[in-house]
């Protein structure tokens, strides 16, 4: 097969591992920067171009769309979909997961456990918003934040009111979440491919920081997840429509709570923490889907 890896960063570990996994299984891998692509949108032969030339027809693409370019990146993925290319994470699923509020609403609709979350637009709603999530301490998150940036722990009601007022004064979209004290600054990252959790690690925030993101200096170790945690992770990915997902879960007194569903989960951290190769299962999944699509096409023909 010819597989395109859509990434702005060919030198990144995640990109290199995906290329390696494709090639080790006998496939041709191309790294394409989606931001440098441009599209010919027509009803006869839609195409994608790069540096004056038409991009070759791929059997499948693996999107690694950075959060800062979600809109354009999703447009490129959608163009590939229009051309009949299988996307391991389609444009709709990526867009769903990137909208943090919409993602939580989808999880809520499916009955998947998550922290109680409030969302408001007016300063006069702040007192009720704080009560909604059980009072302080509570967590305040910028909807546009990534990798732990724009996440604040307000330890008192007064601090919460001040931070929320400041964000709303800046016209920033924020959500307020209950603080899960028993998680003790750690979470579990489940790496989901299809309907399986292929690896899981426990991430612990640095001393004095409740955020467990590895980019912020957190540590990671392999973890054995419970059947309920496994079920929640797969269900959360499915709720977004994602084939490949990093699902972040908190262990709470009332069971697993899904914090976030990531459509382009990092590969380096989880492979190094667990010793499990997660890039290969992605390629194996693609092989099965493309083979089934070809068989179906032959039957129809």
Swiss-Prot record:
What InterPro entries does the entry give?
A: ATP-grasp, ATP-grasp_RimK-type, ATP_grasp_subdomain_1, RimK, Rimk_N, Rp_bS6_RimK/Lys_biosynth_LsyX
The ATP-grasp domain, residue ranges = 104-287
Q: Which residues bind Mg(2+) 2?
A: 260, 262
Q: What's a GO cellular component annotated to this UniProt protein?
A: cytoplasm
Indicate which residues the UniProt annotation says bind Mn(2+) 2. Answer: 260, 262
Where on this chain does Mg(2+) 1 bind? Answer: 248, 260
Q: Which residues bind Mn(2+) 1?
A: 248, 260
Write out the similarity annotation: Belongs to the RimK family.
**Protein's name according to its UniProt entry:** Probable alpha-L-glutamate ligase 2
**Organism expressing this protein natively:** Shewanella amazonensis (strain ATCC BAA-1098 / SB2B)
